[in-house]
Amino acid sequence: LPTYRDAAEKVREMFLANLALIGEIPAPTFEERSRAEMVAERFAAAGLQACVVDRLDNASALLPGTEGSSTLLLAAHADTLPAEDNKPDIEIHQDRVVGPFVGDNALALAALATLPVLLEQLNIRLKSNVVLLAASRSLGRGNLDGLRHFLAESGTPFQSALCLESFQLGRLNYAAMGMLRGEMTCRLPANYDWAQFGSTGTIIPMGDIISRISRIPVPQRPLTTIIMGTVQGGISPGNVARETTLGFEVRSESASHSEPGARATGGHCERCHCAIRASRSTWTSMPGANRVPSTSDIRWCARAGPFSADSV
């Protein structure tokens, strides 16, 4: 361990430089090109081979192994949520680093770009090839499209893979959860009676939907949860809301529980208010294989495609 710490201290300045260079480039989902080009540039500076940015803005590079009989994938998502400041500054202090999305996922990208230099400092040569990937279009409606595209187009069979997340650097998770993420939208119909006194608009029916979803029984084993993370609707306190949208996510260690959870949320949506059209769109994430304990669940999520269900 002392040897590793000494080597890490030698590349500390490079790591922080990579953090600032990469993290200060805005990269909201679907707009990662500039950040991807910077990551590819840092890969090249670290001596990696085949440093490229593909048409979906994935930045990848190859660290050749001494034998090269197998290939490992080391990936980190490159996109972020939209930022209020289009030019985020990262402040580096003696004991902390402060800035937008440093923890999601700039630290991991900096670690990815610095790893080849650290291995060189430690005089470690891996037998296997390692492909380093900064994946685009991972969050929200990105639906892991960047990773899916890379895996489909690379033509390389990967024996194993690791995903780097800034908040969990130093922690190894060997299991994965299936996920369904979606939206429910209540809209006023075209023939809505605006003259009706006491018109409720769409917020009250959405509140009924949220109440019903919160009462859906979910098991603790396998671990299952329904997260209702966002609600958006209305333009002012004095106007009836024409449209209200709920963003939710169903997570489970078992597809047999996450799929009924998604169906149950849609069912409550359809029963809440006959005058409101409710639409649901879902998208899935987490493709993968050979993962314990939920391999079949992850494959199921990867196969699932967007769908919608409407009712009046």
Task: Name each region found by the language model.
Residues 1-4, 10, 24, 50, ...:
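Metal-dependent amide/peptide-bond hydrolase catalytic core
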Residues 30, 98-110, 197-203:
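Short, conserved micro-motifs enriched in small and acidic residues
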